[in-house]
Amino acid sequence: EDLTLEDLKIRIYNFIEKAKLAVNAIHFDFIIDPSIQNISFSSVEGMNIYRVVQEAVHNSIKYADATSIKVDFRKEQNYISIKIKDNGIGFDAKNVILGHGIFNMKKRINEVHGKLQIVSEPQTGTTVLIQIPNK
């Protein structure tokens, strides 16, 4: 059964609302490009996207000391771009030992033939970029 972007949006929004209750000091933005409102994902794609967004937001809350987290869904050429960006402490991506969370994020996105990129530097925050082929 397919998962609409609206279904995914509700799940992510509910997760963010719960996170807000736990950490009041963080400002969340959740943006979906109106041109992709009607797309849907297979249940495997939808669940993997949800879990990766959840992990990225969780990492921002737990490790980044961020005051702002933005989740942004957009259409770019022939893929859907999902960006999770925080203004936290960042990390040196070259020297960090990847934990299970990041490993699992990459594995989940590979499963749906997507790409995952993490860009971070100390004191500049972290951006997790997910690209999922648009059917």
Name every feature range the model reports, one short phrase each.
Residues 68-78:
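Short beta-strand/loop element within the Bergerat-fold HATPase_c
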